């Protein structure tokens, strides 16, 4: 109970300290609508490098105020950034050091290691066939979902949905949706069985 009270006090302090950033971002949104993300980019970059617990709560307060739905029980570590206002992050989620979250829904108790990239789908800069064929390249942003209780290892790249209770090994690239309750590793990420210290790929 005491710990929760302290967390809420720090949460409020974080909001107060980040008020200038919150006000500037909301004003940009009111004036420019969905296209207004320049101030958002500036603010998230500045706040990402504020150190110590002060920075953690300033980032939390800022994203709680300007994003679609951010739990006050989430944690944003040093260097972490959220790229889009419509991102949602559940209670107990930890956004690791230098992790970037794109257009995503992050479930409760999701843990990310350092340097994880949760990007907005596979086609942000067009499809390969468009580029190879010399066609006009159309940007496309897809919302990705990471299910609750999943753990994503250091430097993993997530371009598709991750089910609940999953483990994504460090350095893996999730290119296609992966079902719940599995361990995945590699580039592209594949499901593996880990028993007695041995790894066997599942077909």
Where are these predicted regions, by residue range?
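Terminal amphipathic alpha-helical/low-complexity segments used for targeting or macromolecular assembly
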Residues: 1-68, 72, 125, 149, ...
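Flexible, glycine/small-residue-enriched loop-and-beta-strand segment within the central core
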Residues: 54-61, 78-90, 94-162, 187-202
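Structural motif
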Residues: 65, 101, 173-174
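Alpha-helix termination/capping residues and helix-transition junctions
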Residues: 67-68, 86, 175
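Hydrophobic beta-strand core residues of beta-sandwich domains
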Residues: 68-70, 106, 146, 162, ...
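C-terminal/domain-terminus segments
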Residues: 160-185, 202-203
């Amino acid at each position: 109970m005491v710990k929760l009270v302290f967390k809420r006090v720090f949460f409020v302090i974080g909001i107060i300290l980040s008020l200038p950033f919150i006000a500037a971002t909301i004003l940009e949104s009111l004036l420019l609508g969905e296209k207004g993300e320049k101030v958002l980019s500036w603010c998230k970059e500045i706040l990402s490098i504020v150190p110590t617990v002060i920075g953690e709560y300033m980032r939390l307060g800022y994203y709680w105020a300007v994003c679609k739905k951010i739990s006050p029980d989430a944690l944003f570590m040093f260097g972490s950034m959220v790229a889009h206002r419509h991102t949602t992050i559940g209670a107990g989620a930890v956004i690791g050091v230098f992790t970037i979250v794109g257009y995503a829904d992050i479930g409760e108790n999701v843990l990310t290691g350092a340097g994880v990239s949760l990007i907005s789908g596979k086609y942000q800069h067009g499809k390969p066939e468009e580029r190879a064929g010399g066609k006009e390249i159309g940007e496309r942003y897809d919302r990705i979902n990471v299910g609750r209780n999943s753990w994503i290892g250091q430097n993993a790249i997530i371009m598709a949905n991750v089910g609940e209770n999953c483990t994504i090994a460090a350095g893996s690239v999730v290119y296609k949706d992966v079902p719940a309750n599995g361990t995945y590793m590699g580039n592209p990420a594949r499901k593996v069985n880990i028993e007695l210290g041995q790894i066997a790929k599942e077909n």
